[in-house]
Swiss-Prot record:
It comes from Glycine max (Soybean). Signal peptide: none annotated. Keywords: Metal-binding, Nucleus, Repeat, Transcription, Transcription regulation, Zinc, Zinc-finger. The gene is TFIIB1. Its main location: nucleus. General factor that plays a major role in the activation of eukaryotic genes transcribed by RNA polymerase II. The lineage of its organism: Eukaryota, Viridiplantae, Streptophyta, Embryophyta, Tracheophyta. Belongs to the TFIIB family. It comes from the Eukaryota. SMART domains: CYCLIN. GO terms for molecular function: RNA polymerase II general transcription initiation factor activity; TBP-class protein binding; zinc ion binding. It is found in: Nucleus. Sequence repeats lie at residues 116-193, 217-291. Zn(2+) binds at C6, C9, C26, C29. A zinc finger (TFIIB-type) spans 2-34. This is Transcription initiation factor IIB.
Amino acid sequence: MSDAFCSDCKRQTEVVFDHSAGDTVCSECGLVLESHSIDETSEWRTFANESGDNDPNRVGGPSNPLLTDGGLSTVIAKPNGGGGGEFLSSSLGRWQNRGSNPDRALIQAFKTIATMSDRLGLVATIKDRANEIYKRVEDQKSSRGRNQDALLAACLYIACRQEDKPRTVKEICSVANGATKKEIGRAKEYIVKQLGLENGNAVEMGTIHAGDFMRRFCSNLCMNNQAVKAAQEAVQKSEEFDIRRSPISIAAAVIYIITQLSDDKKPLKDISLATGVAEGTIRNSYKDLYPHVSKIIPNWYAKEEDLKNLCSP
């Protein structure tokens, strides 16, 4: 339900949408406020034919403003019966496939972004933002000859940053169909440059904080709720100190400290695998954090005497 102004009730009232008739009806007086409306969202009901093919949706997917004509098109389907109609339909279908589709490459790119997003468990808003970034880059007609997989992965990386749900380059790389971290990094710089030229100013990427990765990293290590809470508090306190390490490295080092103070200690190798940070980098970050552990680690999680049991770097 939603609210709309009813001319009979003379005020905002709740309205009901009658999908079968396409009418918007006032829930209080029954006045039809709008009739024969078209629902542009997907229709999930399917209508089977007798040919044994997959059930087609009668309306199909919602319109996509990034595609020509909103992505809406006419498809010549096979007839249910046999005879000459089937020959005519198949002939028309071949001609349709031969026709130029300006969005064919774009649709394939969007499918690839959707697949990568699904594999990383990203929300739809990030996928849509990545699609928008890719479309803007493609409209400039300057990306030919570049690694397509790296370009799409970089669009997804930037979208995650802009939606305040950052992922590490290594995480993006794991679903990038073979594109390397170096290639994705180059593609990211290229996209930022192109979009900056388009807008006339720098592209806002969003600020990365160590806490952005903490819950996911802890989940990868199957840490208990108490340890996760302590790690989140510790990484937040660490921002008060001038620790010149990347947020991801700080997150990994904090996890190492928290697990060393618990009964469920995690080997450095496991933390490295879960966070994508090299063991040597974690050690160096731990060395920088060590002088501040008494102020970083929550008192409810570890006492002063517990902190003395930590290994000196």
